[in-house]
Amino acid sequence: MTEFKETELDERAIKMAKVLSADAVEKAGSGHPGSPISLAPVAYTLYQHFIKHDPNDPNWEGRDRFILSGGHASLTQYVQLYFSGYGVTLDDLKNFRGGAATRTPGHPEYGLTPGIEMTTGPLGQGFASAIGFAYGERFQRGLLDPETPKEDSPFYHKIWAICGEGDIEEGISGEAASLAANQKLGNLTVIFDANRIQIEGDTNLVLAEDVLKRFQAYGWYTDEFSFIQPDGSYKEDIEGLADVIAKAEKAAPDQPKLIKVHSLIAWPTPGKTNDPSSHGSKLGTEAVAGLKEALGYDPEENFHVDEEALAHARKVAERGLEAHKEWDEKFDAWRKANPDKAALYDRLKAGELPEGFDKALDDLEATFEVGKGVATRGASGSVLNAIAAVMPELWGGSADLGGSNKTDLKGAATFAPAECATKQWPNCNEFGRQLHFGVREFTMGCITNGILLGSHTRPFGGTFFMFSDYERSAVRLAALMEIPNLYIWSHDSVAVGEDGPTHQPVEHLASFRAIPQLEVIRPADAFETAEAYRYFFEKKNTLPGAMVLTRQSVPVLAETAAKAKDGVKKGAYVLVDTEGTPDVILMASGSEVQWAVAAAKTLAGEGVKARVVSVPSMEWFEEQDAEYKEAVLPAAVKARVSVEAGVAMPWYKYLGSYGKPVSIEQFGLQGDGAQNMIDLGITAEHVVEAAKASIAEVEAAK
């Protein structure tokens, strides 16, 4: 049992939350009113009595984290932020969904509204990312305070989330939940709002299984509570709900927890309660008036604030301030006792790289041999291990492809309870830095997003480039949130070979380059790979990056040995040049740079002056000023060729009217990887032919 006793002021605050939610959607003319109305008592109970937070300092290190996975119900959270004193105002509620300047968008957006921990909306991602938050808490605590019992550590906190049937129906929640149980994430509690309604009607049509039994099978602690009484009446008993939550917290310290709350959507709105129409549309003037009458409000008054109830709810800020002061004492004692760890914490919080980062890369590059064949995935693995030696905050793994992606950190313990140990991975402990996601690419993307949002550490996750499609929605969300997640995608072309076209990416470079604020990086060789990592970690903007890497060996180029350090960070740079103005520019990325270099030599032998431009990252190149772009790709040189083992779509902005792509505009082939490249025209000979054709067209147009 909890010490919490519901008062009349609590009841009045919950009623006010319902009315404000209805008014906000009505004024906006669109939105999702039903869930915020029926979730009001749940959210109020969490914010007032369970979530440890300080509205005076939304970014307080010691706070619990709350994620509203069903982001369409955003007013559920906005109203509680208003009640708690986060700086969300009544005017903000009135401006719900109100355009680019609003602080209360239709779905919560990270970095826009104080108290919002992540952007949610695509269902299931908040649920899965909440698991990432729990990963991040545990690893960071192990990094900074491993010896202290977790409840006594200033770095221990809990993760709270609310989800609905839509989240549960999305496959991502199931695959992530399975992994969460395996990890024994006892600081994660998810409230499952089971109102049995979605846009197309009663969920019995599509969700027939016993969800709690499914989660029990995963290894979760489960319980349930119902506002619907046995006699059919409805009672929002928040004392009873609080007791169930408190019981779960005590009973399952080492299990993630799912608490199913049976509710009626939009209760007590006349004509809209338990009706699908209340899910995603405004209620209408008559229904809103009926809701207000049912709750004792004037149906003619909009956005009425019960000042006494609001003042009561705002007392949570006083409790938060007191909790913050207690935490400060604990944190200060930790800092005094652990000066080295405190220095590490300060560096991580500031986002600074460690001493020795550049030297680790320089020393590695000194081992590269010009002319030697090295797959860029192999170079990537060498880089990760080199910088991991000086970056304790770097951790990650793969979706069951670590040996292929080269994402294994040599000698690192596995992040998993000791009982998860296997013959292949005998060293498991809760603070390990080697991650294993199983065959769960989407979960991997969501978890690493959550790690970034919930800690000061730097995760990475790897898979085959072909399977990045499974991860795409999480990648897009990272780009939208502008967080520096690191995706490592190997086996990047038809050179994958005998696995055939199901495993040979063709359209993927174009499709990921189409995502705004995602930096796609495809290095040509070992030197470019090392420099790509250097710049990704050194740059101060906070965008996600995708390292797209070869399966096959590619030669370490003499030209990159001399120029990559200054060139890669520019996104595109002159790798091979000529005397005077070139006759043609050959642009290439990744494994095809070697063919552009070879073609330039052939053309030179025929008296054609060809400049080779390596383009490891179009996004980084687009960040450069006009003067630099003109120096690399002078407008006067209209004969151009692009060379990339994928569709040519992204290259046309550089090719101009007379340029010729050497590309792959079909699915791959079953067969040897090198032969596939030849059969599909990715050769130096084809580059030479394309260069001559482009030059001829330019001449003909004169």
Regions found by a protein language model. Give the residues of each.
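Residue(s) in the substrate-gating loop at a strand-loop-helix junction
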Residues: 165
